């Protein structure tokens, strides 16, 4: 599924050379649910951006579904992002002027899916997250928890190989956070691979495996023995 080996990412500002990721290697199998943890500046978000094909590494290799994506062109990476990866962000990243349904359809618009099929698949994705009664609402007419459910529906509408969630409960209250984690656990139980960045221990305990970063390196990688089921 996902295999990175000795990946390196550095940023240079003036005379300062900052190593954000230092020879990181990790393998994620199909169907896993992994929580990526670490303090601010540990490299966890940089790692998520690299495996999400949103950024480029300075060294090492990255295989996604058996394909080496380490040195692909920008248009090739964009195609992989749209086809293979479903993103869920802390800030939801919904377009405010269009409806919930149209927001969920967006990845398929970029993929050239015909309008009728777009609508059918978007409605199916919204049904999975329990939002079929909000399809014609705009983002400013729904709650934060509902916005994140729309974002999840958008992430799964293309049946991606992996769902990548960056602090998906960071802007939510406890009740909404539980609702979101229930959805992620359900999707994972149905076979989806989920990689989630979080700083919350309670949220991390809902995953099956935790990988901890510090100073650009992995310092911990373990299976959760007593998983929290929401």
What kind of feature is each model-predicted range?
Residues 1-213:
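ABC family nucleotide-binding domain
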Residues 209, 217-230:
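Conserved beta-strand-loop-alpha-helix hinge in the C-terminal portion
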């Amino acid at each position: 599924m996902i295999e990175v080996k000795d990946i390196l990412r550095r940023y240079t500002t003036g005379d300062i050379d900052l190593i954000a990721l230092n020879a990181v290697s990790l393998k994620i199998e199909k169907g896993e649910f992994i929580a990526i943890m670490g303090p601010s500046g540990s490299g966890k978000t940089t790692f998520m951006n690299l495996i999400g094909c949103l950024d480029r590494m300075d060294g090492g290799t990255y295989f996604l579904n058996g394909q080496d994506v380490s040195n692909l062109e920008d248009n090739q990476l964009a195609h992989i992002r749209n086809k293979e990866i479903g993103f869920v962000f802390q800030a939801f990243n919904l377009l405010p002027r269009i409806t919930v349904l149209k927001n969920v359809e967006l990845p398929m618009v970029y993929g050239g899916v015909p309008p009728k099929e777009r609508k059918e698949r978007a409605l199916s994705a919204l049904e999975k997250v329990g939002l079929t009664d909000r399809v014609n609402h705009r983002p400013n007419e729904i709650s934060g928890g509902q916005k994140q459910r729309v974002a999840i529906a958008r992430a799964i509408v293309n049946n991606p190989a992996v769902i990548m969630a960056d602090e998906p409960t960071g802007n939510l209250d406890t009740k909404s956070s539980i609702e979101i984690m229930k959805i992620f656990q359900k999707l994972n139980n149905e076979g989806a691979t989920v990689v989630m960045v979080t700083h919350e221990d309670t949220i991390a305990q809902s995953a099956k495996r935790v990988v901890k970063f510090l100073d650009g390196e992995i310092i911990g990688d373990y299976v959760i023995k007593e998983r929290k089921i929401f």
